[in-house]
């Protein structure tokens, strides 16, 4: 028996010695006020807010890549749409029995107006530079065909004209007019095909990667900000004093681990946010699971083609398709150079990040979310069927899809590019077991000391209002102070007000942001 105990003791020492040594190797590098996990549009937006609201707070940003904005915020990893609900038909679902509900569209439009104000303030204060490096006017067009879809689009247009936010939108079912708006879409099209389109001249194309880089560059000029690149967060633990210890590994230095102790932690790590949230142990994390969906685009840089299309043309999603999969033919602008993208085509990978691990999905499954995830799979057969169909597509299938929007397209002009990964939220539900949540959701601890952003579209375009909501949720007392209220209204002049229905305020805000960002402007007129 003694020999057995001795062997067990020795084995325990052998197994645990490396762990103990690793623990000893950790060093509490510093104590800080705020840790931002992830170097994307969300973390950078929150960081700038906090620097402007509370300049004395120290902030550390931890990013696993060798630069910021390398995952979903990177311009090539997303559609670059300034989501304003001008053309995205999924925000206004059809209702054959009554008026179309535009409430979700209004929510998206109001949110993007906040982003425009946030960016304008940063331009005025030298945080962002050269607005055309990150945002440009590109008309937003909805384009459909067939009796049912054209009737829906007219129905939608009529409903949206009752809102002051959509004045200036044009509707047409005349092929010649639509050809003026988007010539590539019309050339070579069957003249007998019934078509319709709406056009909003004040739409935008946005490079969220460029915004992120500029925001972080500005943050780096402050002495109480530190950026840790090539640093992967390995653990997040609550301390006895309700602070948090964030352990990260230096991927360029033998994965040496360091610890930062922080009063507040934000997990803005895109698809990786779910697994990091689960590491915190907060009960709120138990409500969530995630399902990854990737994307690919066809792209052309042929100048003869690109110069003849200056628009984002969105179609109608297939039944069961997620919002991010609405087909669109887009003008994109990178470093001043326009290109055309078409897609997205959904892909499947078990990775939660483009540069993630194939074990991400399996690693995120827990006792608390396995049943909600199962229920969502069973209840969303159309989505599963759609994804299978997308994954099975070959080059000919993708090109056939392109020709529905660009009939005269030639294969040799286009190449396939892989975009970023998204993780759709799956949330526990008392009635259904689990539901697939579209959009984004802030998850925070009860005491507000840690928060994460889960979900996908519209995402980046509404980073400023989403982070504003986070401030209101986790820094409620601070937001209520005269100092923060005054600064927030300076950053976002419409803070606390809705633009819809307020013509004077809408014109004032849009005129201000358009002139500051160098964008097209349309004065809103009474109905």
Swiss-Prot record:
Pfam families: Mqo. Its cofactor is FAD. Gene3D superfamilies: D-Amino Acid Oxidase, subunit A, domain 2, FAD/NAD(P)-binding domain. Its EC number is 1.1.5.4. Keywords: FAD, Flavoprotein, Oxidoreductase, Tricarboxylic acid cycle. GO terms for biological process: tricarboxylic acid cycle. GO terms for molecular function: 2-hydroxyglutarate dehydrogenase activity; L-malate dehydrogenase (quinone) activity. PANTHER family: L-2-HYDROXYGLUTARATE DEHYDROGENASE, MITOCHONDRIAL. Belongs to the MQO family. NCBIfam families: mal_quin_oxido, PRK05257.1-1, PRK05257.1-4, PRK05257.2-1, PRK05257.2-4, PRK05257.2-5, PRK05257.3-2, PRK13339.1. This is Probable malate:quinone oxidoreductase. The gene is mqo.
């Amino acid at each position: 028996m003694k020999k057995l105990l001795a062997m067990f003791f020795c084995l325990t020492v052998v197994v645990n010695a490396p762990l103990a040594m690793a623990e000893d190797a950790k060093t509490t590098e510093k104590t800080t006020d705020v840790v931002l996990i992830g170097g994307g549009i969300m973390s950078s937006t929150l960081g700038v807010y906090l620097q402007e609201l509370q300049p004395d707070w120290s902030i550390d940003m931890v990013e696993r890549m060798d630069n910021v904005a390398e995952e979903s915020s990177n311009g090539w990893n997303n559609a670059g749409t300034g989501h304003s609900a001008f053309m995205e038909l999924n925000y206004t679902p059809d209702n054959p029995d009554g008026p179309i509900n535009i409430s979700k569209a209004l929510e998206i439009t109001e949110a993007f107006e906040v982003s425009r104000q946030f960016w304008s303030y940063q331009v005025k204060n030298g945080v962002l530079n050269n607005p055309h490096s990150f945002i440009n006017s590109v008309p937003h067009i909805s384009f459909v065909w067939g009796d049912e879809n054209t009737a829906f689009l007219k129905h939608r247009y009529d409903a949206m004209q009752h809102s002051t936010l959509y004045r200036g939108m044009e509707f047409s079912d005349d092929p010649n007019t639509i050809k003026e708006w988007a010539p590539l879409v019309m050339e070579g099209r069957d003249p007998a095909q019934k078509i319709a389109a709406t056009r909003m001249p004040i739409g935008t194309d946005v490079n969220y990667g460029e915004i992120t880089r500029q925001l972080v560059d500005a943050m780096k000029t402050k002495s109480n900000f530190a950026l840790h690149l090539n640093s992967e967060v390995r653990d997040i633990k609550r301390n006895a004093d309700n602070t948090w210890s964030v352990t990260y590994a230096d991927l360029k230095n033998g994965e040496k681990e360091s610890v930062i102790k922080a009063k507040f932690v934000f997990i803005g790590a895109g698809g990786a946010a779910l697994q990091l949230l689960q590491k915190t142990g907060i009960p709120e994390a138990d409500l969530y699971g995630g399902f990854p969906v990737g994307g690919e685009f066809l792209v052309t840089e042929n100048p003869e083609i690109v110069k003849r299309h200056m628009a984002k043309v969105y179609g109608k999603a297939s039944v069961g398709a997620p919002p991010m999969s609405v087909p669109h033919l887009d003008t994109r602008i990178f470093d001043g150079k326009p290109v055309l993208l078409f897609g997205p085509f959904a892909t499947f990978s078990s990775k939660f990040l483009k540069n993630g691990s194939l074990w991400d999905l399996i690693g995120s499954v827990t006792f608390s979310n396995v049943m909600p995830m199962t229920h969502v799979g069973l209840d969303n057969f159309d989505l599963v069927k759609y994804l299978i169909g997308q994954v099975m597509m070959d080059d000919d299938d993708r090109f056939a899809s392109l020709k529905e929007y660009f009939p005269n397209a030639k294969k040799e002009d286009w190449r396939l590019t892989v975009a970023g990964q998204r993780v759709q939220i799956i949330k526990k539900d008392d009635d259904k077991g689990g539901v697939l949540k579209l959009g984004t959701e802030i998850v925070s601890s009860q005491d507000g000391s840690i928060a994460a952003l889960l979900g996908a579209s519209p995402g980046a375009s509404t980073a400023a209002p989403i982070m504003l909501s986070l401030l209101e949720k986790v820094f409620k007392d601070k937001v209520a102070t005269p100092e923060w209220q005054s600064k927030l209204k300076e950053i976002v002049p419409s803070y606390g007000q809705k633009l819809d229905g307020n013509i004077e305020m809408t014109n004032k805000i849009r005129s201000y942001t358009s002139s500051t960002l160098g964008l097209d402007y349309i004065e809103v007129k009474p109905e």
